[in-house]
């Protein structure tokens, strides 16, 4: 399962619903984009050290998904499809969606705009 920034934040705050979903999923992957967004949030937090320590521990046990050439093809297809539908989504989320499609993994996110992406399964909590 791939996690979006809002799911990662909820997990860091011990949201029981998110923890339950992640426990059932077994493996978790974090897109490099999500890692950047989350670290930006940490930098603004009063609890910076606590969240950075939590993230460091988490990263020992989960994959970080990088963007590569195949990702760019998925990105282009998704962006074009959503533009044609008149339903654009934020650029970072396009990259996250592209990684989900590339790796055939569902996305844990509260952002319903991911539901517009053909071939992507979004899980909420």
Stretches with model-predicted labels:
Residues 63-108:
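Active-site neighborhoods of divalent-metal-dependent phosphate/nucleic-acid chemistry enzymes
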Residues 3-4, 31, 88-90, 111:
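Histidine- and aromatic-rich ligand-binding microenvironments
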Residues 97, 101-125:
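Acidic, PIN/NYN-like endoribonuclease modules and their adjacent C-terminal/linker elements
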Residues 1-30, 41-59:
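Short, well-structured N-terminal submotif of metal-dependent ribonuclease cores
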Residues 35, 48, 52-55, 72-75, ...:
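A general structural signal for well-ordered alpha-helical segments in protein cores
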Residues 8, 35-38, 72, 114:
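A generic structural signal for short hydrophobic patches within well-formed alpha-helices
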Residues 4-5, 38, 75, 100:
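Generic structural signal for small/hydrophobic residues in well-ordered secondary structure
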């Amino acid at each position: 399962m791939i996690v979006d920034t809002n799911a990662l934040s909820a997990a860091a705050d011990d949201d029981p619903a998110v923890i339950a979903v992640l426990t059932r999923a077994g493996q978790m992957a974090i897109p490099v984009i999500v890692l950047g967004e989350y670290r930006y949030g940490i930098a603004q937090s009063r609890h910076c050290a606590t969240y950075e320590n939590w993230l460091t521990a988490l990263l020992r046990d989960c994959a970080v998904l990088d963007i590569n050439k195949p990702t760019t093809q998925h990105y282009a297809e998704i962006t074009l499809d959503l533009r044609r539908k008149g339903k654009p989504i934020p650029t970072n989320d396009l990259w996250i969606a592209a990684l989900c499609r590339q790796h055939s993994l569902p996305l844990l996110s509260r952002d319903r705009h991911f539901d517009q992406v053909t071939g992507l399964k979004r899980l909420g909590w």
